[in-house]
Amino acid sequence: MKVIGVTGGVGAGKSEVLAHLAGKYNCRVIMADRLAHQLEEPGGACYEPLVALLGKDVLDGNGGIDRQKMAAAIFTDEILLQKVNAIVHPAVKQALLAEIAQEKAAGERDWLFIEAALLVEEGYAGILDELWYVHAEEGVRRQRLRESRGYTEEKIDAILQNQLSEKAFFEHCDVVIENNAGLERVYKQIEKELGENQWQKQRNFRDS
């Protein structure tokens, strides 16, 4: 089984790439953000440390962490943000290592895709066989964010300023998936990297 990281800037189209992979190939897709959310729930590895750091004011009526309240608490406090990241990021990485080990032991899938915005910054190269960068020009990304999410230019500017530069992404990635000109071209690039529809091929074999 090959472990492939998928990263890229906001609006690049990672979700479409991952949906295609999950539907067409014998693989599993893990979203690091969703894994982090699970770890932040009551009973998760990050819950108690985060509550101890941020206080009970960030809890909702059911005792869970209200993500909007947490975001508001760290939005203008860089030091607090770093402390939150120091709790969450190592826990996510450990959880991912456990998932990788489990999938390799099962031996049922050909690929495991891990999506995370900070794969480069957090030093995930050591646990990945390849790193894919989903790339779209900034103008294309801005248009997508305005149209699909209703973001203002000011909000887009703030997000882009906090993301890794294109140069850094290009320097660290093994494969670039260009997503400037429609999904059919994206799918052809993926097929070039992975081959034909492996999931369909295996399913047809089992059904015969």
Report each predicted region and the residues it spans.
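Hydrophobic anchor at the beta1->P-loop junction of P-loop NTPases
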Residues: V6
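The conserved Walker
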Residues: V10
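Walker A/P-loop
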Residues: S15
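Short beta-strand-centered segment that lines the nucleotide-binding/catalytic pocket of NTP-utilizing
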Residues: C27-E40
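ATP-dependent small-molecule kinase phosphotransfer cores
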Residues: H37-D110
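Small-molecule kinase domains that catalyze NTP-dependent phosphoryl transfer to phosphate-bearing small molecules
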Residues: L96, A125-I127, E147, Y151-E196, ...
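ATP-dependent NMP and nucleoside kinases share a basic, alpha-helical "lid"
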Residues: L97-A105, W111-E147
